[in-house]
Amino acid sequence: TLFRSSLVDGDQVIDTYQQVFGVRTIRVDGARLFVNGEPVHLTGFGMHEDHQTIGKAHNDALMLRDAACLEWIGANSLRTSHYPYSERILDYADRHGLLVIDETPAVGINMGLGGGIFGAQGYPTFSAETINDKTQKVHAQVIRDLIARDKNHPSVIIWSIANEPESETEAAENYFLPLFDVARAA
């Protein structure tokens, strides 16, 4: 459905904004995902919106090439790995039935991952010197901003609030539980 709103002054149109809007239902039952009442098995990729010649700039031709690759492989979904993508990709996904896991740019919330891989000095992920209350407040606002921007895209079925974070500790639970609530409330 297309909604269009115009700001007018007398007979003169000052500005017009249009927004495509769609409705879908998402339900999880055990390990099964249902979209609009139908069971769905996600097949797809965590992708990156970048290219060696243009960097992170959006390019419609590259978007269409990526979409053709997704279709060729039989994928029905994509994850906006590590950061939000251009709204153009979400518009494309809305029109073509792709399901999207929309991710915040919260990468590196796992000090053990880098330290374990590179043998570096181990630091706790959550502490006054690393990931802390200030980080959590900014992270919460990033979640609100992402959901405010993308909530009308029916292709978005999951909000991913972090990429590969520390998740097995009590400190991680204390950090992330309030952020889950932020996402649910947004």
Language model features: what each stretch is:
Residues T1-L2:
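Short, small-residue-biased leader/transition segments that mark boundaries at the very start
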Residues S6-G122, A128-F176:
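Active-site-adjacent substrate/metal-binding segments within catalytic domains
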Residues A93, A183-R184:
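A generic structural signal for well-ordered alpha-helical segments
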Residues G112, A185-A186:
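Short, acidic/small-residue loops that bind anionic groups at enzyme active sites
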